[in-house]
Amino acid sequence: HRTDRIRPTSVSLRTDSAATRAEAVSGDLSLTFSTPQSADSLIAALTRSARTLAGQIDTQSVDMEQLKPALPDFALRVSAGPDNILNSLLKSRKIAFDKLNAEGMSCDSLPVSVRLRTEGLTYGNVVLDTVTADIRQNGKRLEYVLGLANAPGNLDNIARAGLYGHLVRNTGQVNLYQRNRAGREGFRFGLDVTWTDSLIRASVTPSDPLFGFEPWTVNPGNYLIYRFDKRVEADLDMTHGDQRFAIRTPPGGGASGDIRLDIAGLNIGPALGLFPSAPPVDGVLGANLALNL
């Protein structure tokens, strides 16, 4: 059985023909939303932007220059500490934070942007000192950056890490990096992704990625394709010295859905050691399999 006390809470809304402003305070959580539009104009703009967004989802095509004019001009700010209803809800799922700040805005002279920063984010026994997110418009693109930074003595193998990339039309890019306390890179690789109404295609980049602190080589023109009729096609061959990870469709195509997986001398210890709470496992992995998917 769990109970939670009711914190002092206030909510206010002011609107006229020129502007709308909403404020809410509960415990140490504060939210402010403002727009230079009346309530009726705001509702109409939200309906219009929802319709534009739904159209982009239907066509599976991201275009921020098309979405931006449909959005209302607005400014949103949220700040919170440990004593509020949001933290209480998260704690029921074993998540909590010490401090949170977020802001979002869109106006005629500036692109759409959303920023978020949390400090002391915990999940179970894992503590992340600082987590940041930055999502913004750059022309037609929607660009994103997620960052993680830990203080000395906490997760020193992941002193800094980040995920960044963009979405535009029917293409996307995902890049990952990680550095330990000494500044040594453990991971640095990315995926270029395209999609249609029948498939998703991904390619590993760059040609010299890092996995588990080790430099690898990736074959030019590599790809992984998943078709929505559940067929898989691939031509990916990554090597580092005597280590190899390859997944390929057999020459000539083979039977529909045939995939060959070739793993040789793969050292799993360095990569596993980067993850929090990973078991102390080491070894060399090898396999040569023919799969029918």
Question: Model segments located where?
Answer:
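Interface amphipathic segments
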Residues: 1-288
